[in-house]
Every structure is written in C-alpha cells, then in structure tokens.
From Swiss-Prot:
Miscellaneous comment in the UniProt entry for this protein: The oriT nick site is located within the nicK open reading frame.
Protein name (Swiss-Prot/TrEMBL): Putative DNA relaxase NicK
One matching Pfam family: Rol_Rep_N
Organism this protein belongs to: Bacillus subtilis (strain 168)
One GO process term, biological-process aspect: DNA integration
InterPro entries found in the cross-reference section: REP-like_C, Rol_Rep_N
Keyword Protein biosynthesis annotated: no
Length: 352
C-alpha cells in the first residue's frame, strides 16, 4: 500500500534534544489517559490524603455525584465521589485525560510516578474499573483512512469480531475530515480507538489543520477485570508501553494479502511490525499541567469578556464605574473561593 507511510527508524525515547538544548516531545509518546478506581470504604478523607496525597482544603465539595454516588470532592478534572453511609459503593476516584495531566503535576512535585499511585491504590484496597492508555503519533506510522481501507479488504486479523468507524467530509468540496476506527464493541471490557487527532483538535479549538501537522492517536480502553489485570501487570513489569504493545498485538494485526496461502498465514505488514516494535520501546511520557480551571477562564474570555468590554467602554465614555462596581459588589460562592485558593497556590501547597 503506497499510501501507508513507512515509519521512522529513530523513534526511541520520550524526549529529543535540539542543538540549543531545547527539549521537545518525541513524535511517538504514550501516556495514562483515564483512571477510575473504587475503594470499599466510606473514609473519603483517607483516600484523598493517602492515595491522591492532596489537601482537601483545595477541593470543592458538591452534594451530588455520578454512578450512584451522592457527593463529590473535586479539584478541576480530578474527582472523588463518595456514597451514602449505607451504600457499599464506597469511594471512587476518577480522572479524565486532563485530570491525569493535572495529577502528574502533583506526582512531579512529590517526585513520584504513576506506578507509585497504582501501588497506593492497591494498598488501600482499590479496584480499577477503568484504565485508558493513549499513544500520540506525530510521525504517523500509517494513514488511518488507508488503514480503514485495509481492514475493509479483510487485511486485519483480530480477536474482535466487529469494528466500527466514523468520519466526515465537506459537502461543498468533498474534502474529508478526520477518520476514527473502533476495534471491538464500546460495551466490551476492552476496545481500541484509532483516530486522526489533528482533525479533532482543529475543530475543537478552531485551529487551521496545517498548523497542527500530522497527528494520530491510538487509545486502549480497558474496563473492570481487563483494567485490573493491566494494572497488576504494570506493577510487576513497571513497563507501561510493553503492556500497551501486548494489548494491541493481542487484539489487532494488519497483514498483506497473499492468495497463495490461507489468511491466517498472511505475513504481518511491514508498517505494522515497525509500529509495534517502536511502541514496545517507548517509556511512559509525563506532561504535567499546572493550569487549573482553564475551562472557567476560557468561558469568561469567550462568553463574558465582550460584554464586560462593552460596559467598560460605556463607563469610560459616560464617566461611570458600573463595571468596577459590579465586580466589587459580587459575592463569591464557596466554589469560587476554592478556585481562587487553587489559582493562588503553588502545586507544593496542595500536596500532603
């Protein structure tokens, strides 16, 4: 397949260094992308302090939750749900991809790793019910639309029985948008998702596609027993990307058709062998994010700032102080006070 790109052969580490000692991301990195772990205890304070190692003083409490939990402590995208005293759900920690990046800033501050967090969870009787691993590929070992065509021709040998895909195109010119391939059912305990991250980010943030360059993302989404098995293996090997490679290789293999032999004996495609080989050599990438509540600031900028500017210009023209008066007279709710505490604190102030 001419359209499937041949992979690079010097993609070995997380960081490469330019001539001026400027560290940049490697074109191929793997990272923890989603965590959900439950504890059969109602001692939410102990879980926050001994598993997350965060000060509850910086967390906002809500008298509501998800998944049947009745309350939530949250620090932006890091969430801790708790159940009613007579409900054996106990406590649940949940971190989205952004939450994982934020939590890495606390791990970095404590000079700890994800493996330390996994170990803390296990020591407190934690049970992992969701664990996602993401691999970002900015060298693009293959074109996902062409990978889809290869799969549709029967050149993908998989333990999954079914696959799904979606995509888009512009009706005015026929130019295609991003393509996503799902291997396995979203309802199953394990499935893979390969998609063109550059298209997703361009649409989400209204960025020209050419500014983002090539960018594929490969996500491994594990639930319940599959998630727990992966964590147990990680604690033994301390090698997240080896586990990722084994999971991908266990479920999906792209091959080159050969009418002279049976399908199960078709040779693995060179691009796929090289991709799997390089993934197996990747260390875990950590990208701590120290900006919290960015969503609130973005909302203020996009939704409120134009109105505030209008009132400010009217004040300046009319000699009034309406805007400054409104700000001075505004009452901060508890959640705003907590957010302000987080804005003004150093990361080290929030860990215990």
């Amino acid at each position: 397949m001419d359209e499937l790109k041949q992979p690079p052969h010097a993609n070995r580490g997380v960081v490469i260094v330019k001539e001026k000692n400027e560290a940049v991301e490697s074109p191929l990195v793997s990272m923890v992308d989603y965590i959900r772990v439950s504890f059969k205890t109602h001692d939410v304070d102990r879980i926050i302090e001994e598993v997350l190692h965060l000060s509850k003083d910086f967390m906002t409490e809500k008298q509501s939750g998800f998944y049947g939990y009745v309350g939530t402590y949250e620090l932006d995208y890091i969430k801790v749900f708790y159940s009613a005293p007579d409900d054996n759900r106990g406590v649940l920690i949940e971190m989205s991809g952004q939450g994982c990046r934020q939590f890495e800033s606390f791990l970095e501050c404590r000079k700890k790793t994800w493996y330390d967090f996994f170990q803390d969870c296990m020591q407190q009787g934690g049970s992992f019910t969701r664990f996602d691993l993401a691999i970002d590929d900015k060298k693009t070992y293959f074109s996902i639309p062409e990978l889809l065509k290869k799969a549709q021709k029967g050149e993908c040998i998989s333990r999954f029985r079914k696959s799904d895909f979606n995509g888009s195109f512009d009706l005015s010119d026929g130019i295609t948008g991003g393509t996503t391939i799902y291997f396995g059912s979203k309802k199953s305990e394990a499935y893979l998702c390969f998609y063109e991250k550059n298209y997703e980010q361009a649409e989400k943030y209204n960025i020209p596609l050419e500014e983002l360059g090539d960018w594929n993302r490969y996500e491994l989404r594990l639930k319940n027993e599959r998630a727990q098995v992966a964590i147990d293996a990680l604690l033994k090997t301390k090698d997240l990307t080896l586990i990722a490679m084994q999971i991908i290789n266990n479920y999906v293999r792209f091959v080159d058709a050969d009418e002279n032999i049976t399908r199960e004996h078709w040779k693995t495609s060179l691009f796929w062998s090289d991709f799997i080989g390089d993934v197996g050599r990747l260390p875990l990438y950590v990208k701590p994010q120290k900006d919290f509540y960015q969503k609130s600031r973005n909302w203020l900028r996009n939704s409120c700032a134009p109105t505030m500017k209008m009132v400010l210009e009217a004040d300046e023209h009319l000699g009034k102080t309406d805007l400054s008066d409104m700000i001075a007279e505004a009452e901060l709710a508890d959640k705003h006070k907590k957010m302000l505490d987080v804005y003004m604190a150093d990361v080290a102030d929030m860990v215990v």
